[in-house]
Amino acid sequence: MAGIFIYGLSPSFCPDVVAVNVSHIFLQMALWRSSDNLVYLPPTPVSKVLSTDDYVTRTNIYYYAGSSRLLTVGHPYFAIPKSSNSKMDIPKVSAFQYRVFRVRLPDPNKFGLPDARIYNPDAERLVWACTGVEVGRGLPLGVGLSGHPLYNKLDDTENSNIAHGDIGKDSRDNISVDNKQTQLCIVGCTPPMGEHWGKGTPCKQNASPGDCPPLELITAPIQDGDMVDTGYGAMDFGNLQSNKSDVPLDICQTTCKYPDYLGMAAEPYGDSMFFYLRKEQLFARHFLNRAGMAGDTVPDALYIKGDSQSGGRDKIGSAVYCPTPSGSMVTSETQLFNKPYWLRRAQGHNNGICWANQLFVTVVDTTRSTNMTLCVSTETSATYDATKFKEYLRHGEEYDLQFIFQLCKVTLTPEIMAYLHTMNSTLLEDWNFGLTLPPSTSLEDTYRFLTSSAITCQKDAPPTEKQDPYAKLNFWDVDLKDRFSLDLSQFPLGRKFLMQLGVGTRSSISVRKRSATTTSRTAAAKRKRTKK
C-alpha cells in the first residue's frame, strides 16, 4: 500500500519564519482488491410447462359413460390359494385396500361423431376431457374388525399399577382393533403414486444381528389391492417387523402405502392427480407396550432406579409404547361417495384431458368394512356343539362409476407436436404420426436381388408390438368403449349435469290438440263485425 506524506514547514529550517501550529496531513491511495465472496451465476431458466387449456380446444359435445355394477368378494385378512387340502381359490378382499380402476375409453378419432365437420383430421386430433365423475357405493355402512390371535401385547400401560421389569418368553395375546377410518378418491390419467418407509441400505458392511436397519422413503405406484394406512403407519411390515405380531394379520406381511400428495401435486404435467377427495379419522383406543429386548435402552439420566423392595421397580419395563387405533363412528352425513363432482379447474397443468384414452380412479372407503361371518354345520346334532360348525369370513364390495366426458380437439402445429412428443412420445404414435429421422451420413449397403440365396438373408425384423407401460401393474380394468351415449337425460349423472348447465330435461314430445271446427255462421259474424 503506497502512501503520500506531506509535512508542515518546521521553524528549524526557516529561522525567519515565526513558529506556528503545524499539523501533519496523511493521504492514502485506494487500490482495487479482488473480493473473497463467491460469484453466483444466474440460474438456468426452467422449461415452461403449458397448460392443456393453451392448446386444447373444447367443443360443446358431451357424452355420458357408466360402468355396470362392479362386485368383488374375498377373505378380508389373507388370500387362500388353491392347494391339495383346499379346492377354493379365495382372493384377499379388504375394505382397507386401494381400489384402482383403469377406465379404458374409446378412441374419439375412430368414434362415430354426430357431425363429421367438428374437426379436420388432416390437422387436428380429438381427445376426451373428464368434466364430471360420480363414484357410487352400495351395501350398508359398517365397522369391520382386524386383529391378530398372537398380538405383541405386554402390559396395559393406560391402567397399569406395577412396572414389570421381567419379560417372559411369550406374552402375546388375541387382540382385535377397528382400524383408521379413511375415505379417498383420486382421479387422473396415470396411476397414482404412493409412499412408504422401507428398509434402506446400511453404510457399514459389518452390521451385527439385531441392529436397527436404516429407513428409506420409497415412492412407488399404487396398485389395486395395496393396503392403506390402517393407523400403524405407512411402512413395509414384512421387512421391518420380523416377529409378525406387532400389527394385525391383514398387514403383518405386506406394505401399507400412503398417497404421495406432495409428489403428485409437484408433478410437471399434472397427469396422476386432477383432483382428490380425502377424509381421515382416527383416535387411540387402548395403550400398551411391546414385549422384547430394548434395542434403544433408556438413558440413566432420565429416571431414578427403584429399590429391590419396591415391588419390581428395580428394573424398568418396556418403553416401546403403542396404541391400538380406532376409526370411531361411521355415519352417512360424512360420505364422500354417491354424489357428483364437476371438474372445472384441475390442480395441475392437465385440466382433465384423458391422454391415451384412459382414466385412473383410485378409491378407498373403510366406512363399509363389514366382514360377513358364514357358518356351516359339519354334521347334524340335537344339541349345540361348537366343534360341529365351521366358521368362515368374507367381505364384499360394490361400486358404480359414472362419467361425463367432453369432446376436445388439438391443433397439431409443429410447436405443439414437438411439445407433445417431449411430454409423451407415444401420443403421436397413437395418432399415426411419426418422426422423420435425419439422413445418415455413413455409407450403407443395399443389395440388388433381395431374395437371392447368394447373399445373406435380407428379411426385415418383425415390428415390435406396442408394449403396455402398465402391464406389470395390477389394476381393475373397466372397459367403457361401448358405453358412451349422447342422451344425457337418460342417465342419473347426465340429468344432474344438465341441471348444472341450466338445460331442461323434460321430454320434447308435444301433445297434439284437435283444432276446434268453425261454422259458417261464426265466420259470417266475424266478417260482419269487420264491415264499416
UniProtKB/Swiss-Prot annotation:
Residues 512-532 are annotated as: Disordered. It is found in: Virion; Host nucleus. InterPro entries: Capsid_L1_Papillomavir (IPR002210), Capsid_L1_sf_Papillomavir (IPR036973), dsDNA_vir_gr_I_capsid (IPR011222). GO terms for molecular function: structural molecule activity. Signal peptide: none annotated. Gene3D superfamilies: Major capsid L1 (late) superfamily, Papillomavirus. Keywords: Capsid protein, Disulfide bond, Host nucleus, Host-virus interaction, Late protein, T=7 icosahedral capsid protein, Viral attachment to host cell, Viral penetration into host cytoplasm, Virion, Virus endocytosis by host, Virus entry into host cell. This is Major capsid protein L1. The lineage of its organism: Viruses, Monodnaviria, Shotokuvirae, Cossaviricota, Papovaviricetes.
